[in-house]
Amino acid sequence: MKKLTKTNSHRQQKLASIINEVLIEILKRGKMLDRRLFDCPLTITKIVVTADLKIANCYFFPFNTKLTFNDIMDALNNSKHAIRNFITNKINMKFSPEIRFHYDYGFDNAIKIEKLLKSSSLKDKTN
């Protein structure tokens, strides 16, 4: 029987871990970043590297920020090349992966589900 989900290889997991560490370091220092990101606390929720190790999809979630989603995406995309250069200096590979940023909707979805469950339990209590 075939597996429904494909597991990441050791190399994919190792590269994702290194990229995560480098991104955290860059975000803490604020080096080489768009100025809009200085006062924007971000959490890197997960990093998924493609099987060919050429693309790293980085999922993030902002906390308590005045910036809009589009502002954050623009700032991250403006900083993308500097981040990739920093990652290139940290890894010893022939190619450095392209960095793609994605908003992580997991937290938003969890809040929606929680609200639905609460409203459903309230309806059950009233019936």
Curated annotation (Swiss-Prot):
GO MF annotation terms: ribosomal small subunit binding
GO terms (BP aspect): maturation of SSU-rRNA
Cellular compartments per GO CC: cytosol
Subcellular location, record wording: Cytoplasm
SUPFAM superfamilies with a match to the protein in the record: Ribosome-binding factor A, RbfA (SSF89919)
Record keyword Cytoplasm present: yes
Pfam family, any one: RBFA
Keywords carried by this UniProt record: Cytoplasm, Ribosome biogenesis
Entry superkingdom: Bacteria
PANTHER family: RIBOSOME-BINDING FACTOR A, CHLOROPLASTIC-RELATED
Record note on quaternary structure: Monomer. Binds 30S ribosomal subunits, but not 50S ribosomal subunits or 70S ribosomes.
Function per UniProt: One of several proteins that assist in the late maturation steps of the functional core of the 30S ribosomal subunit. Associates with free 30S ribosomal subunits (but not with 30S subunits that are part of 70S ribosomes or polysomes). Required for efficient processing of 16S rRNA. May interact with the 5'-terminal helix region of 16S rRNA.
Entry's family note: Belongs to the RbfA family.
Protein name: Ribosome-binding factor A
Gene giving rise to this polypeptide: rbfA
